Amino acid sequence: MADLRSNAQMFDIDVSALEQLRVEISATQHQMLMAYNRALNRTAKHMHRVSVGMIIESLAVKGRKAAEKRVKPFVKIRNISKETAGDLSSAKLWYGLNDFRVSELKGRLQNPRRQKQPRDPETGLFLKTKKGARGATFTPRSAGLAMMSWPDSFVAKRYGAKSVWIRLARGGIEEARVPVHEALEDAIDDYIFENIGTVFMGFFEQDLRGRVKGNVHVDPKTGKRL
């Protein structure tokens, strides 16, 4: 069974930048906190959507469902009546980096070429060869993944999926898997980590300015609009 790997990306927010904007547009502390919480939720949902698309594109995943299972957003909203600058709501994105099944990825499947059976030079009889020793090959469409081959494997449609299947020593077969953690970690750094702060600040500023312009206030104890 493939190793279970994960990567959790935390939102790194510059609190001083939030406070600077609050003072600049004359927003209240609670308006800032409400805008912060809403921006956090919007950022988590936005980056989840972007992450799924990033996984599909970077790994050439066949179906959206397989990619969606690899991204989980977690948002912890704190009570605004108890929040301080050092105790704000938090969010993170969890990425599953364990191996993908071959059938989940786009690419070329190839059975091994039939091996010419050798003959005994003295008798002319065919010599025995190890059945299935040579393996099938998978060439991923994604440039971030390398071609792979598995000993004693073959290409066939089993259990509703055309893939590379490996013969097990104990009997039976299992589907071959492709390691993706390195390619995914690079994509996460390139697509997500570099942009998450900018996306959050865009949502935060938009929301906070709207609250100030509309004179929107909330009760710090109930969180209800006044």
Predicted features and spans:
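Short, Lys/Arg-rich flexible segments
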Residues: M1-L226
